[in-house]
């Protein structure tokens, strides 16, 4: 569960290291984003010769959250950091690699390309 102004680590190789949430997409007054939700982010920290630059406004999908989430089978899922993957307008990832584990809930939201690039699906 992340909200406005939350800093997220970027789990792909686009060149961005950290982003900040500007808006949670999906409803008019939606306050919190969960696994698989799309957010509008601003790049806060980036490497010098990456695909994205500091200050750019992009879309991202949440792949890891520190806040635990309960699944239908009763298990809880919790990660060590809040992380996202930068995406294009057509929901495809901007990068070509995904670092770290990602949640299985992304499959239900239609992010199969992100799951195929991920090292580990939890």
Curated annotation (Swiss-Prot):
Question: GO CC annotation: what is one?
Answer: cytosolic large ribosomal subunit
Q: GO molecular-function annotation terms?
A: large ribosomal subunit rRNA binding; structural constituent of ribosome
Gene3D superfamilies xrefs: Ribosomal protein L14
The family database entries (InterPro entries) matched by this protein are listed as: Ribosomal_uL14 (IPR000218), Ribosomal_uL14_bac-type (IPR005745), Ribosomal_uL14_CS (IPR019972), Ribosomal_uL14_sf (IPR036853)
Keywords, ordered alphabetically: Ribonucleoprotein, Ribosomal protein, RNA-binding, rRNA-binding
Per the record's keyword annotation, is Ribosomal protein included, yes or no? yes
- PANTHER family per UniProt: 50S/60S RIBOSOMAL PROTEIN L14/L23 (PTHR11761), LARGE RIBOSOMAL SUBUNIT PROTEIN UL14M (PTHR11761:SF3)
Family per similarity comment: Belongs to the universal ribosomal protein uL14 family.
What does the subunit section of this Swiss-Prot or TrEMBL entry state? Answer: Part of the 50S ribosomal subunit. Forms a cluster with proteins L3 and L19. In the 70S ribosome, L14 and L19 interact and together make contacts with the 16S rRNA in bridges B5 and B8.
Functional note: Binds to 23S rRNA. Forms part of two intersubunit bridges in the 70S ribosome.
Write the protein's name. Large ribosomal subunit protein uL14
Q: Gene of origin?
A: rplN
